[in-house]
UniProtKB/Swiss-Prot annotation:
Enzyme class, first EC level, given as a word: transferase
Subcellular location: Cell membrane
Note: Carbon 2 of the heme B porphyrin ring is defined according to the Fischer nomenclature.
Residue stretches spanning the membrane: 44-63, 68-90, 115-135, 138-158, 166-186, 190-210, 235-255, 256-276, 296-316
Topological type in the membrane: Multi-pass membrane protein
Catalytic reaction list: heme b + (2E,6E)-farnesyl diphosphate + H2O = Fe(II)-heme o + diphosphate
UniProt entry keywords in alphabetical sequence: Cell membrane, Heme biosynthesis, Membrane, Transferase, Transmembrane, Transmembrane helix
Pathways involved: Porphyrin-containing compound metabolism; heme O biosynthesis; heme O from protoheme: step 1/1
Keyword Repeat: no
UniProt record similarity statement: Belongs to the UbiA prenyltransferase family. Protoheme IX farnesyltransferase subfamily.
Manganese is among the record's keywords: no
Protein name: Protoheme IX farnesyltransferase
Pfam families for this protein: UbiA
């Protein structure tokens, strides 16, 4: 969600024929680079890496092989960036209509649609080839599935049609967990699927908390996010239910992955904090609190911290287990 400075007006058609592949000739090199970085949505990628790195530690039962880990992170970043860039191409009309996203490069015409697609497709091809050559076929296949699911299922099929868009569309955001595990073990087991479900159930309340803050944006863009089409009470009830599912599923990793006590204790403590905040907001809604008085962004930031710290515990646990042996 990088914000770029507003450039002088440019001729889109001229930009499309630019030798730089889609950025106006008048654009500086710095603006050119920043625009393409912004297309990748770095903050979204950061979140994906938060889940990829820890699962490799669990899969390796300690520190993963450095070469495989670095390759997975590099090509995983490229894979996510490709999907995000193509998403920017498809959703450029929505981005122009929303205050939160109207400074994205495609919305501001810093990068042309043609340049955006070339960038996205190139990254998709390079990431897939990189996974095949430097990691393994299973990780490559999962990466391709994640890109295709995000573009065709979430962006094209679900986002503009259903209030459950982020529920099922969130599957793409869960894939780095499986990719990280497959990169190390060349197979899939129950443990990564538990962490997959943690991210799956975590995504809707996290996203809806943000959408409640920007519901007018989504309404203006005709995106039927749950906070746009449902009451605050309904939204917060679902946030509570999905938060409970997140916490319960997170505890299943303890017996399935045979962790030390560090992980379940951390998961329980973090879960109590997450649930307390979700219930607090729900109770406020039931008491009639609404609008700006309902501090949903606090829950949004807390849920970010919850997931990050949970996966820190996932990372540390196998290291502790090795130290105790």
């Amino acid at each position: 969600m990088t914000l770029l400075g507003r450039p002088a007006a440019t001729d889109t058609c001229a930009a499309a024929d630019s030798p730089t592949g889609g950025v106006s000739r008048s654009a500086s090199l710095g603006t050119y680079i920043r625009a393409y970085i912004a297309l990748s949505k770095p903050r979204v990628i950061e979140l994906l890496l938060i889940t990829t790195i820890p699962v490799m530690f669990v899969a390796a039962q300690g520190v993963p092989p450095l070469g495989i880990a670095v390759a997975t992170l590099v090509f995983g970043t490229m894979s996510a960036a490709s999907a995000n860039a193509i998403n920017c191409y498809i959703d450029r009309d929505i981005d122009r209509a929303m205050r939160r996203t109207r400074r994205r490069p495609t919305a501001m015409e810093q990068v042309t649609p043609r340049g955006t697609m070339i960038y996205g497709i190139t990254l998709a091809v390079l990431s897939t080839v990189g996974f095949v050559v430097f990691v393994n076929w299973l990780a490559a296949a999962l990466s391709v599935f994640a890109i295709a699911f995000y573009i065709f299922v979430y962006t094209l099929l679900l986002k503009r049609r259903t209030a459950q868009n982020v529920v099922w569309g969130g599957i793409a955001g869960c894939m780095p967990v499986l990719i990280g595990w497959a990169a190390i073990t060349e197979r899939l087991d129950w443990a990564p699927f538990i962490l997959f479900l943690v991210v799956f159930f975590w995504t809707p309340p996290h996203t809806w908390a943000l959408a409640m803050r920007y519901r007018e944006d989504y309404a203006a863009a005709n995106v039927p996010m749950l906070p746009v089409v449902a009451s605050d009470r309904r939204v917060m009830l679902e946030c509570v239910l999905y938060s409970w599912a997140t916490v319960v599923v997170s505890l299943l990793l303890w017996p399935i992955a045979d962790t030390t006590l560090l992980y379940p204790v951390a998961a329980a403590v973090l879960g109590v904090i997450l649930l307390a905040q979700a219930h607090r907001l729900y109770n406020q809604v039931r008491a009639g609190v609404s609008g700006s008085k309902l501090k949903t962004m606090g829950f949004f930031h807390l849920s970010n911290a919850y997931l990050a710290l949970l996966f820190v515990a996932v990372t540390i646990d196998p290291l502790l287990a090795n130290a105790l042996r």
